[in-house]
Amino acid sequence: MALTPGASGAQTAFGPANPFYAPSTLPFHAPPFDKIKDGDYKPAIEAGIAQQLEEIHAIASNPAEPTFDNTLVAIEKSGQLVNRVNYVFNGVTGANMNPELQTTQDEVAPKLAALQDGIYLNTQLFKRVEKLYNERNKLNLDPESMRLLEYQYQEFVLAGARLSEADKTKLKKLNEEEANLTTAFISKLLAATKSAAYITKDKAALAGLSDAELAAAADAAHERKVDGWLLSMQNTTQQPELESLSNRTTRQAIFESSLNRAERGDKNDTRATIARLAQLRAQKAKLLGYTSYAAWRLADQMAGTPETAVKFMDELVPAATAKAQGEANDIQALIDAQHGGFKLAPWDWNFYAEQVRKAKFDLDESQVKPYFELNNVLENGVFYAAHMLYGISFKQRTDIPVYVPDVKVYEVSDADGKPLALWYCDYFKRDNKNGGAWMDNFVGQSKLLGTLPVVYNVANFSKPTAGEPALLSFDDVTTMFHEFGHALHGMFADTMYPTLSGTQTPRDFVEFPSQFNEHWASDRAVFPHYAKHYKTGEPMPAELVAKLEKSATFNQGYKLTELLAAAQLDMQWHTLEDDSKLQDPDKFESEALSMKWLALPTVPPRYRSSYFMHIWGNGYQAGYYAYLWCEMLDDDAYQWFEDHGGLTRANGDRFRRMILSRGNTSDLDQLYKAWLGAEPGIAPMLKARGLEQRAPAK
């Protein structure tokens, strides 16, 4: 086997000693983290790339006439080594990055982009796929195989398979640059977010935080080897501590540090990177024959066109902003009643909104948290709902190696006792972990490859001090249910082909199962099962439950407006014309929000352009609207469950059979309508948020 240079420049052989050389012998082919070293990834990825290119060349140059088996099935079977490594590499770099892994990521990202070009821009290979596509009605394919053929043909066309050789060369250069810029953005943002942490030696500046929160902040400072207290930044604009901090100067400092984290004029400033990314994507779309990058990206999504997605969002803006303005008026009235002597600013919103909530509903976040202990929420909430709906059960596996000690592993069994999946959870915040929460696979399900799913969830909950419980906000609880909804989508995958399996669906469908699963967090058949005091085990008092339910639609104007602002901002960035000059991100952002009636001074976007990880680093470019689109689907879906008896095995099994197990094996619009029995609409979505439907602004 050839030698490849390691991250340090030394020559590293890829051979049997590398843990990725052969499929893992652990249960479910779980990654052997006890054997994997940082230096193992690069040689394995490079060997995997070379191997798949050889496999693709053999398929493309096969002298035999193309058949479904010798072309489409052969493509599905190719790349098993590179996929085996890359699934694990992506998981570890997202959740446990270090300098050596960062160097490896920088080096392999353009090579992996080139691999995709080597497949989808291969003229001989496309001719074989195209011939089969043109003759598809004569091939007697089963529905899933027909879907694979039609899907792959579309993907080849969208990737540029029909371009001239000269244009393919241009496209490859753009793809390589995009891969490099994406990696650079991720690296810069991780460092910028870490350096934006708020550090103080003055305990009085942190007045309002609980003793547990202060202890966690002291621990965080100690880990960074600084004196005092440290509050690290989450990926969103607003920060959770702003609900509690009574010192307005501290709130402003934290908010502005969050807002400007990647705009400090230093090496981690992302503005030049994102400006070029947006310009490059517009150029790429033009080369591929589309009016904008968004038009290209949405060609294989449920919405179909950016115009459809924007129209959908425009319909939500009036209701959202009207509610947000009403909420702002309530908050200003409270500030005035307290003789605050200042106008509401964005760093004040969460602090005073929490007070308004207390006044309106007599509800305090600190009253609620003791009833949401992480392990209890997981086992008696998340797992319980899944068991009641789908009959599955969970057993912790302490014998499966993990990449950091905080990670837990569970074996998931079906109702008949058969092994279904492995599931990992990595819930606590670390400085070397990307912000937010997500799900992905270490191993994907495929009957063709004989693999069962190995799925993981990652979050950024505050880690308690030693010996203390991890108490969650209800937003955190909802996040757990959300990400586990993605996990169920992956675990219930029951498809032949890996390309169509599990969460391998359009962005504006993939968030539907996850957001649907959020509903069970507050469902009356589930909530009492896990909402119990961590000290006494007593259930949450009925009076407190009622307050929580009544406050469910509180602050929804703000929440929907900040989400719409981010989604519209994303769409504006990705509908630029190809000849657009490099944009000034701050000016562009201001103008884009004003144009969409979303420039509310007290309601900033959930993400500003400079730290919008979803669209510059996580594959959601021209796709952040998907969260709202899927909210329409999931609220309609939960309404169906309520109308048909709620949390029952019959309902769960039907949903699993018709939606969760199907991956992308059918037209998803038809799949959804067949399950629901109707067209989706925004009425249940607005009802769930406590909003009134209003006509869009003109």
Model feature map: region roles:
Residues Q11-L209, E213-A215, F641, K698:
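N-terminal helix-rich structural modules
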Residues F14-K35, G208, A216, G228-L230, ...:
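C-terminal, non-catalytic "cap/extension" segments appended to globular domains
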Residues T25-D40, F89-V108, K131-K173, S232-A272, ...:
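Short His/Asp/Glu-rich catalytic/ion-coordination signatures at enzyme active sites or charged loops
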Residues A58-N70, Y293, K395-D399, T499, ...:
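Surface-exposed patches in mature extracellular/periplasmic domains of secreted proteins
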Residues Q80-G91, E150, Q154, E256, ...:
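Short, hydrophobic/amphipathic alpha-helical patches that form generic packing surfaces
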Residues L148, S187, A192-S232, L280, ...:
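Active-site-proximal, well-structured secondary-structure segments within enzyme catalytic domains
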Residues S462-F481:
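Short pre-active-site segment immediately N-terminal to the catalytic Zn-binding motif
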